[in-house]
Amino acid sequence: MKSKEIRNKWLNFFESKGHLIIPSKSLIPIKDDSLLWINSGVATLKDFFSGKKIPPSKRLTNSQKSIRTNDIENVGKTARHHTFFEMLGNFSIGDYFKKEAINFGFEFIFDVLKFDREKIFFTYFSEDLETLEILKSLNVPDSQIIKGSRKTNFWDMGNGPCGPNLEIFYDRGPKYSNRGIELLKNDIENDRYIEIWNIVFSQFNNDGNGNYELLKQKNIDTGAGLERLACILQDTPTNFETDLFLPIIKEIEKLSIYKYKIDNYFLKDKIQEKINLNFKIISDHLRTAVNAINDGAKPSNNGRGYIIRRLIRRAYRSGIFLGIKGKSFLHKMTQIVRDSLIYDIDVEKVSKIIKKEEEMFSKTISEGINLLKEKIKSKFPKDNSIDIENKSQVAKYFKENNLTFDFSIAFELFSTFGFPVEIIKEILEDEYEIELDISNLPKYLEEHANKSRSENSSAMQKVINSLELVKEKVSEFVGYSTLKTKSKILYLLNETEEIHFTNSENEISYLILDKTPFYATAGGQRHDKGLLIQDKNRIEVLEVFKDKHLNNVHKVKGKILKSELINAEVDSNIRIGLERNHSGTHLVFNALSREFGKEIEQLGSDNNEERLTFDFPLSKKPSWEEIKNVEKRVNEYINMSVDREYIITTLEGAKKLNAVMTLEEQEYMDPNEVRIVNFPKITADLCGGTHIENTKKIETFKIISLDSKGKNKFRIKAITSKKIVEEYLKDEISKNKLVLENLIEKNKSLFQGYKMNFSWSKNLDEQNEQITKHIDQARSDYKKLLKNSENKLEKLESDFSIMKFKNTEIIFDMNLKMASLQSLVATLREKNPKAIVILGSEISKGKFFICVGSKEFSAKDISNIIFEKYKGKGGGNNILSQGSIDKKIEKAEDLFELLKEKGII
């Protein structure tokens, strides 16, 4: 059955049951700060369920486009993980409840889709006896009903509506696993029993403290993955062989030197697995990029745009692995993606955006890979005994010699050649099994930006000084009162001489005008940006700086004729951003002085249109509470709506007025004519920069970081304007929620009953602080849980078999209880990061469940070797893998020899 038919059958069926069909909404949430993307069918209907809006019908159904990107690296490594998917849903808002919802499910599954009754299994919440009775009344055999726990069958976000849920599974048979119903009973990840439908019975309200009351209005919220249903109805090993993905894969094959092999799911050829993986990455990421761009997202360096950029780049790199030639290829498949779906997609627009992103990336990727290989080769012995193309040999050499890849080298490849650090990390870890810690990336980025600014400014100053043509101050700055002016070109220069014209739109030159509205970088404020316009030529102003005579020098790109007048136009949006942040710097200086006293002075500042920094001395590091007091005081100043005043006087006159002045301000100002920027009743400062007309126009002020810059020196980084602060908070909330989710999962690996109760404020600032506190709590809980597990381990460790080879330990035991395996392996893995942990439990006569964990080695590779030797099957990831085997591993020595033979150790 084709995917379009499945989708239509769903919508038509529920329409026949009185449901209103709701068209799929945009992937970009509208007025919902809690989501980066629409990630489920119910996400667009939340206002109906909460009562904020009246639904057009109490019965709704949809097929909703969704994106989830919290686990991008796992795409293609599992049978069903995608970044873009479609969720089929039916919803009742205070109308029908359990009996009708389950009956609808039965009718659709058995009468419409014609599933075999013997292959459908149900899991329910153990305390939900009503659901159990309904299932029995529908003649479901006891053998196909599995009792679930609160963890598996109770939908609860920690605060608000919640309730038990019924999960419906399809059994794909023993060819996907010899193990039977125990997989469902023990909630073991597998490819045999596939969850096709989840029906949530929203009947309780959690007050946030774990107290549950019955809701006055009971609701139904369901979700069925279209890709999963297609996989079953089209009888494919994974979702990637369905008609939603295969046409894209076939199109990729036309460009690749390789072929995608469907049967390799069963054959398990390692080389072909890698080939298939890259086909899957391209097909998945392309679907996401096409749909997200069509809905308004654009590749960029932050938020949604960064995710799209990352997906396109990952797909492009997979294309290189598959031997696809040319600067761009992904954009050619936009139409194929469009044809596999039902949504209106502007193929031309989307294709152009993807092509531009590809071409931009193609300039760095191929050279970057070669440079990366050279950096890896620098670690090899001088006898050239290691082949860089033999990736398993390289991986083994790095492990045996405890070699690492220095992050500073990775950053050098990024800063010098533009090779993205995330791509470097993926190549190292995926292809060479070399870990790369990128946690220091933000710090390196800031240091690199500061260094680049300094070097660039010095280089341009050298250009002007070396010509010795400009003998005095000849240029007037008029930017305090206007952003536009018609000017005469006094000097047109290149790097060696004075010139009369430039020939190319890409030619760089330097201008001094008789008058200019462009502010030059000085006093901690960055230069203005904008255009010079001469006839039809639009000349981009790249940078503005002062020469030794204090003339404003414009570094520009474009065609210019010196003899003609030129229009100078400052970008007003960038100017107002600069003014907000420069005025914000004055206010934060004053607020810091009021909080900490006379010890505060300005050691340095840097303001651009996006943010400000302020460096100051203090004998001890400020507490975050003190920093929040400073932030609060600045916002109070903003809300006072104080008009800015300019006072022109001499340096001596400024001193008599007690104006605040820094050495930097005194150095670049003419002592006979200095400017004081005065915000009455707040602060008066010697300053030549541009400033906001009224404090209210700063809108809002937020401190986003406090860093140490040496002994007793600190730097505040802050942002202004409602738009920038809101975007920052949304981005932080999104990132922090992912961190929190991962921490909760990590804690659950140590204690399955672990959970946290959430209650988020609608205020973004408060919500972000709440999430941060939950992150701190989760980290604290992890330490306690780990300690608790370690205490339990002390009683068991003497029974473990431990073998050591060079720096590698194998920790082994096959006689443990099933329930404790995962937490034991997780604890031992964290406690012994260089060890391979293999623990097992007998689950039936002659059958054993094993769990493998390691931080140094791939747990998945090790478990696959064990499954091959001991007739088993399972799955997992690089740090934790599990499954069953039909033969007991008798002793650690057997494992040691097996892993040594396979080149793991």
From Swiss-Prot:
This protein's record includes keyword ATP-binding: yes
Cofactor(s) the record lists: Zn(2+)
Main location: cytoplasm
Keyword Protein biosynthesis applies: yes
List of residues binding Zn(2+): H582, H586, C687, H691
Co-factor binding details: Binds 1 zinc ion per subunit.
Top EC class for this record: ligase
Catalytic reaction annotation: tRNA(Ala) + L-alanine + ATP = L-alanyl-tRNA(Ala) + AMP + diphosphate
SUPFAM superfamilies: Class II aaRS and biotin synthetases, Putative anticodon-binding domain of alanyl-tRNA synthetase (AlaRS), ThrRS/AlaRS common domain, Translation proteins
One MF annotation (Gene Ontology) recorded for this entry: aminoacyl-tRNA deacylase activity
Subcellular location: Cytoplasm
InterPro entries hit by this protein: aa-tRNA-synth_II/BPL/LPL, Ala-tRNA-lgiase_IIc, Ala-tRNA-ligase_IIc_anticod-bd, Ala-tRNA-synth_IIc_core, Ala-tRNA-synth_IIc_N, Ala-tRNA_ligase, Ala_tRNA_ligase_euk/bac, DHHA1_dom
Pfam families linked to this entry: DHHA1, tRNA-synt_2c, tRNA_SAD
Superkingdom: Bacteria
Alphabetized UniProt keyword annotations: Aminoacyl-tRNA synthetase, ATP-binding, Cytoplasm, Ligase, Metal-binding, Nucleotide-binding, Protein biosynthesis, RNA-binding, tRNA-binding, Zinc
Documented EC number(s): 6.1.1.7
Coiled-coil regions listed: none
Biological-process GO terms, alphabetical: alanyl-tRNA aminoacylation
A GO cellular-component term linked to this record: cytosol
Protein family according to the UniProt entry: Belongs to the class-II aminoacyl-tRNA synthetase family.
Function (record text): Catalyzes the attachment of alanine to tRNA(Ala) in a two-step reaction: alanine is first activated by ATP to form Ala-AMP and then transferred to the acceptor end of tRNA(Ala). Also edits incorrectly charged Ser-tRNA(Ala) and Gly-tRNA(Ala) via its editing domain.
Comment text on domains: Consists of three domains; the N-terminal catalytic domain, the editing domain and the C-terminal C-Ala domain. The editing domain removes incorrectly charged amino acids, while the C-Ala domain, along with tRNA(Ala), serves as a bridge to cooperatively bring together the editing and aminoacylation centers thus stimulating deacylation of misacylated tRNAs.
Name of this chain's protein: Alanine--tRNA ligase
UniProt organism field: Mycoplasma mobile (strain ATCC 43663 / 163K / NCTC 11711)
